[in-house]
Amino acid sequence: MSLYEMIGDIPLFKNFSEEDKKAFAKMDHSVLAFSKGDAIIKEGENYTSLFLLIRGSAQVTRKGYDTPVALLKAGSVFGEISFLTRRARQSNVIANENILAIKIDDSFFAKLEPAMRDNIKNYLIELLANRLDSMNEALSKIAKYARGYAVL
């Protein structure tokens, strides 16, 4: 299967024209393979690459917590906080199985046509807004559950 075929239905590319998808797929970029258990991102690292999971699944974890924060599947984007803000990584991303991911670093991003860059940035803004909405909903449920319990 070609990279163009793999990215065809991925949400990040929903506002790309077919020509832009083809151009993106032909560009010289890093498609990386990871094995089950590999750390794709490590909490505290100062790397700023964005990743697009094109095959497989991974879990997001935080140091000091046993429960995964999120499950990523094909089509998921991760590393966006560091990519946009240049802050250190805030979590770990661990491969649940053998996966393929596209790595988008600053030099690759700079080579994209302005319309492609804008589409990616707009998608990341929408993604972050949706994640914030989900976290606010979860916090509201926790707060509702915690009412009536004394804080010691």
Regions found by a protein language model. Give the residues of each.
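Cytosolic regulatory regions built on CNB/CRP/Popeye-like sensor folds
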Residues: M1-L152
